[in-house]
Every structure is written in structure tokens, then in C-alpha cells.
């Protein structure tokens, strides 16, 4: 267990807050003369931390005001709502490489809007301009070293965003890590990832007990020990192990529970069995990590498997769609050799939502023409022309335009798509691909303009404005994933009235309805080593079906079906709440639905 080394600081030392800015709720907790830091946050010393209990303010009937003084909806907080702590390596918009960051960016505010107290804990990869130094320091044993760790904090959309500060995460003190969260380049991990994520898990267990947070109008003080932790993917799989060995074995966190969420079963954290000693766990936990497979990487033979341990040691296992949950237990290949363990422990699938504030065609700052379901048929031809002009395609509102947005790798089926383009490009169609990933795939899509100058474009860059323009201006969104736990591209596309042509896998089955909001190609071969000719044929055939409907009344109806759906996080948050309440943590009660407190910050960059 960590040693607390927080000292008593005056407020102006920490994060630059003035004394006038920081006198929020001074009388709520008497903490042995500790000085207030930013926004009412105070360090907690080791004498106080076991005595603190969370207090909740009475909910305001008039709603709260955001930082600009404008009313931004109502949040109804019950005194006995859950204390939820989400732990992950990505939290949008501060740091994300895929769906994990979007989930931890969007789901916590939706649960906060239901009246629960919610925290996220994530590494501090960059110097986020809206996250303040709390001046709380803890010492953690990582491998054979004792490492001091600081906590930074930001309060956004009703959620305490906590960032773990350590040189293993923030490699350049003055600069950005370039979104290289897991390794120096795609497909290559940092050698010390096990130590990095061990530190993250330990810090996440300390945060609810040592951070005295008072930014909310509804809650104050530390979260206490009656907490539900939600660990996300293999990087956080040590959390239930440390909870049991470092805390519950000493009578601490006795009511706390851990839910473990699988966002992508393909990434499991497999390492040499000899590395178990780095984790500082008792030998009795070796069985939870012990794993033998037929692969030579990272070493041949016996290994430790972090995700296996997370599944076996957590109190409940989740994943990000009902159909993906079914796939994970269906066979060895789809469960990636963990299917037996998932069947033993059980799994609950809940579809993701999406950020309907950032992705809103009626207010999208990247679109020249704003629209809703009543004006979509007038707006989309204009937006398609603007998109064609932007990428250098012949401007023609009457030619169908297919878009692809995603990582250029085997999981997303970019190799299948590339093989299929030459077969369907002779049809009356244009295609635009946007994405980054493996160099060989980036080079392939960049050659499309040379091969089909009037038909195709490939942009191997991270380009947010272009992603929004494609989502709005394309007639179809092509999603040829070999497997897709949930997927967000299809949600964004449907929100903007763009039907999807998608593989029948994972969350795509749950969210895209054949003939109603899109077209299903069928399931693809999950073997990423080769391109199955049958999969290529499925793409060609389904593209043909979609193009045959283009311009018809049925197609207009499909566009409106897409836009009429409820795709926000409200529904998923209610489903998550129901299952988390079943864990029976003391003091937990259902929330009351309200609106999110404030819009998400759109830009969080390093301070020079």
C-alpha cells in the first residue's frame, strides 16, 4: 500500500490558484488546518485519510450554471448514489487512440448526470492546460523501486478527471508525447509497459482515498472506501489484484468492488512468466495470470496474461456490445483463447453511446452547411460537393461517394477494402479513405489517387475536420472490420444521416439494422494473416446492393431512419447503472436522470 507524502501547502503554490479562487466549501471537512489548493481541493495526510467520509450537498432544484454563467441543464444528485471510479489508459478528449478514450470521455458524464459521483483516473501524458496540480503525492512500489506519484485534477461535465503524473507517462517534461501512449510506433510497445500500468493501477486505488475534492456543487471530500472501480482493458487488470492484496487484506476498501470491461480482446498483455515478480503480487495469484499459447511472442511457451487475471479476479465482467459478448464465448478464435475463462466468469454486453454534443450536424463547426432531419436531403448534396472539392475529386453531386474512416490495420479490414476497390471501382462511384496506421497500408491508400485519379482518394493523416466532412458529405460509410467490439464510426455516420455498409460482427450487428439503417456484408474471416477472397466478394456484392438503392425513395427513408435514432450515452448509462448497482456496494442507490452539466472541452493541449 502506498505511503502518503502530501504536505500542507498554501494555495498559490499549487497550480497557480489564488486564495480567493480556492475557498470553496471550507467548512465542510475539518482537516487539521490543511490549506486549500485549486477549486477547493486539499491534500490529505495519512492520519486523516482513513477518517474521511464523503458528504453530499442538497441538489439544486434550479440546476447549476456552467463556467460561463449560462444554465446548462439539471443534474439530480441523491445522497446515496454510487461512487464510481473509471480507470483507463485513455480519456477523451485529453488522450485517445480509439474507442476506449471515447468511452471514458462520454460514459462517466452520463452517469454523473444520473446523480452519481464519478471520477476517471488516467496517466498524464501531456501538460493538459485545464488540469491542476493537487499537490498530493503518494509513494508506490513499482517493481523493485519506490516511485513518487503526483495527482493532477480537472472537473468537467460533472466528473472529477484525475491524471497520474510520473516520468514514465510524461516522457518530455516540456512538450507532447505525440499520442504515443503504448509504444514509440504502431505495433511496438514500450519495454516498461508492465511497470507503467502497475503504477497506474496502484495510483487509481489511492486517488479516491487521498484526494479531497470539492469542485462539485453536489459532493465534497474524498470518495471514501465504498467505491465501484471500473477497470478498462488489460492495462488495468492488476487493479482487482492489488485491491485484494494491498487493501482488503488490511481491512481497507472492504465494500469496494471491481468491474472489468473488455474493449478489445485482441490486446491481452501477454508477457514472459518470469515477469510475474515485477508485479509485487503474492505467489497465490500466479494461477490467475498463468497462460500457455502456441505463439512465440513475446516469448515462447508459458506466459502471464494480464487480461486473464482481470477477468478472473474482477467481481463482474463487461464488454461494449451484446453481440460481442456472445462472440467472445462462442469459440477459441473469437475469444482469442480466453473464451473458457469468460464463460466461467460470465459477461455482460452493453452498447456504447456517442458524444452527441461534438457530433451534431446542426452545430458542427467543421461543416459549411448545418442540418437536421428536416433539411438533410438538401444539405448533403452541398456537403458532398464541398468534400469532393476539398480532396480534389471531380465535383458531381449525382455520383455516389463512399467513405472509410479508421485505423489502417487488419482488424479494421483496410487490407480487405484495398483488395476490393479494384473490383468495384468501375461502378459509378467515388471512394475516400481517411486513416493512419501501418506504413504498408498508408502507402497503399496514398497510391489510390495515382491508380484512379477521378475515382479515389486516400489521406493517411489524422485530420479531425476532414473526418467530420466525410461523415456528413459521404453517401455511405464502409466498415469492413474483421471484428469490431462496438465501433463508433457507424454511430457518427448514422447521426449525420449516412447509412453504413458494414461487416456483420460485434457491435455493428447491434447498432446497424439491415435494410433500415444500412447494409450488412456478413461475417468476415477473423484470420488477420491473409485476405480471404470470399470476404472481398462480400464487399463487392454489398456495395453493389447499396448503389442500387442510391437515389431512391427507400434510400431517403433510410437516411431519415439513421437520424431518428437515440445514440447518446443516456441509454447505455442507465444500463451500466443497473448492473453496477447489482454489485451491492454499501450506500448505492439508483440515480435520477438529468442533463449533462456542461459541454466537453474540445481542446486540451500541452502548455508550452
Curated annotation (Swiss-Prot):
Subcellular location: Plastid, Chloroplast; Plastid, Amyloplast
GO molecular function, one term: alpha-1,4-glucan glucosyltransferase (UDP-glucose donor) activity
Top-rank EC class of the record's enzyme: transferase
EC number: 2.4.1.242
Pfam families: Glyco_transf_5 (PF08323), Glycos_transf_1 (PF00534)
Transit peptide extent on chain: 1-76
Positions that bind ADP-alpha-D-glucose: 96
Gene3D superfamilies tied to this protein: Glycogen Phosphorylase B (3.40.50.2000)
Key words of the record: Amyloplast, Chloroplast, Glycosyltransferase, Plastid, Starch biosynthesis, Transferase, Transit peptide
Principal cellular location given in the protein's record: plastid
Catalytic activity: an NDP-alpha-D-glucose + [(1->4)-alpha-D-glucosyl](n) = [(1->4)-alpha-D-glucosyl](n+1) + a ribonucleoside 5'-diphosphate + H(+)
GO cellular component: amyloplast; chloroplast
Pathway named in the protein's UniProt entry: Glycan biosynthesis; starch biosynthesis
Family per record: Belongs to the glycosyltransferase 1 family. Bacterial/plant glycogen synthase subfamily.
Chain's role: Required for the synthesis of amylose.
Annotated NCBIfam families: glgA
Protein's name in the database: Granule-bound starch synthase 1, chloroplastic/amyloplastic
Organism per entry: Ipomoea batatas (Sweet potato)
Gene (UniProt): WAXY
Amino acid at each position: 500500500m502506498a505511503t502518503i507524502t502530501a504536505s500542507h501547502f498554501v494555495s498559490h503554490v499549487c497550480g497557480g490558484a489564488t486564495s480567493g479562487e480556492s475557498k470553496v466549501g471550507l467548512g465542510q471537512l475539518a482537516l487539521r488546518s490543511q490549506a486549500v489548493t485549486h477549486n477547493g481541493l486539499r491534500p490529505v495526510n495519512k492520519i486523516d485519510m482513513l477518517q474521511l467520509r464523503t458528504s453530499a450537498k442538497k441538489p439544486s432544484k434550479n440546476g447549476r450554471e456552467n463556467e460561463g454563467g449560462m444554465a446548462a441543464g439539471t443534474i439530480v444528485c441523491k445522497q446515496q448514489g454510487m461512487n464510481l471510479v473509471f480507470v483507463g489508459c485513455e480519456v477523451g478528449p485529453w488522450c485517445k487512440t480509439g474507442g476506449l478514450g471515447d468511452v471514458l470521455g462520454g460514459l462517466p458524464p452520463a452517469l454523473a448526470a444520473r446523480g452519481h459521483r464519478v471520477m476517471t483516473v488516467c496517466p498524464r501524458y501531456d501538460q493538459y492546460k485545464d488540469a491542476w496540480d493537487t499537490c498530493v503525492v503518494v509513494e508506490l512500489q513499482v517493481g523493485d523501486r519506490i516511485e513518487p506519484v503526483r495527482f493532477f485534477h480537472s472537473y468537467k461535465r460533472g466528473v472529477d478527471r484525475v491524471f497520474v503524473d510520473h516520468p514514465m507517462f510524461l516522457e518530455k517534461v516540456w512538450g507532447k508525447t505525440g499520442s504515443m501512449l503504448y509504444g514509440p510506433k504502431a505495433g511496438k510497445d514500450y519495454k516498461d509497459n508492465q511497470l507503467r500500468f502497475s503504477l497506474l493501477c496502484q495510483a487509481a486505488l489511492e486517488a479516491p482515498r487521498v484526494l479531497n475534492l470539492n469542485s462539485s456543487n453536489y459532493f465534497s471530500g474524498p470518495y471514501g472506501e465504498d467505491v465501484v472501480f471500473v477497470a478498462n482493458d488489460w492495462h488495468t487488470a492488476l487493479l482487482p489484484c492489488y485491491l485484494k492484496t494491498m487493501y482488503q487484506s488490511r481491512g481497507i476498501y472492504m465494500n469496494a468492488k471491481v468491474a472489468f470491461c473488455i474493449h478489445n480482446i485482441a490486446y491481452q498483455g501477454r508477457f514472459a512468466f518470469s515477469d510475474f515478480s515485477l508485479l509485487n503480487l503474492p505467489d497465490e495469484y500466479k494461477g490467475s495470470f498463468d497462460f500457455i499459447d502456441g505463439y512465440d511472442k513475446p516469448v515462447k511457451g508459458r506466459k502471464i496474461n494480464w487480461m486473464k487475471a482481470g477477468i478472473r479476479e474482477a467481481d463482474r465482467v463487461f464488454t461494449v456490445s451484446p453481440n460481442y459478448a456472445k462472440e467472445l464465448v462462442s469459440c477459441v478464435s473469437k475469444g482469442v483463447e480466453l473464451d473458457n475463462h469468460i464463460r466461467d466468469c460470465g459477461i455482460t454486453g452493453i452498447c456504447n453511446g456517442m458524444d452527441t454534443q461534438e457530433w451534431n450536424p446542426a452545430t458542427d463547426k467543421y461543416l459549411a452547411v448545418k442540418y437536421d432531419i428536416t433539411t438533410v436531403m438538401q444539405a448533403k448534396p452541398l456537403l458532398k460537393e464541398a468534400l469532393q472539392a476539398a480532396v480534389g475529386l471531380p465535383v458531381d453531386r449525382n455520383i455516389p461517394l463512399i467513405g472509410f474512416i479508421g485505423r489502417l490495420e487488419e482488424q479494421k479490414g483496410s487490407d480487405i477494402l484495398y483488395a476490393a476497390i479494384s473490383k468495384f471501382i468501375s461502378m459509378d462511384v467515388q471512394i475516400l479513405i481517411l486513416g493512419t496506421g501501418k506504413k504498408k497500408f498508408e502507402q497503399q491508400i496514398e497510391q489510390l489517387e495515382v491508380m484512379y485519379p477521378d475515382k479515389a482518394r486516400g489521406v493517411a493523416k489524422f485530420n479531425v475536420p476532414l473526418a467530420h466532412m466525410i461523415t456528413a458529405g459521404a453517401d455511405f460509410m464502409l466498415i469492413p472490420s474483421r471484428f469490431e467490439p462496438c465501433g463508433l464510426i457507424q454511430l457518427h455516420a448514422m447521426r449525420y444521416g449516412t447509412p453504413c455498409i458494414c461487416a456483420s460482427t460485434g457491435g455493428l450487428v447491434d447498432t446497424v439494422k439491415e435494410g433500415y439503417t444500412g447494409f450488412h456484408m456478413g461475417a468476415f474471416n477473423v484470420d488477420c494473416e491473409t485476405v480471404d477472397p470470399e470476404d472481398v466478394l462480400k464487399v463487392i456484392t454489398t456495395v453493389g446492393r447499396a448503389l442500387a438503392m442510391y437515389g431512391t425513395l427507400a434510400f431517403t427513408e433510410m437516411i431519415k431512419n439513421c437520424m431518428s435514432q437515440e445514440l447518446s450515452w443516456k441509454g447505455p448509462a442507465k444500463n451500466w447503472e443497473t448492473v453496477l448497482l447489482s454489485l451491492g456496494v454499501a450506500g448505492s442507490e439508483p440515480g435520477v436522470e438529468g442533463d449533462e452539466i456542461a459541454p466537453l472541452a474540445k481542446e486540451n493541449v500541452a502548455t508550452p
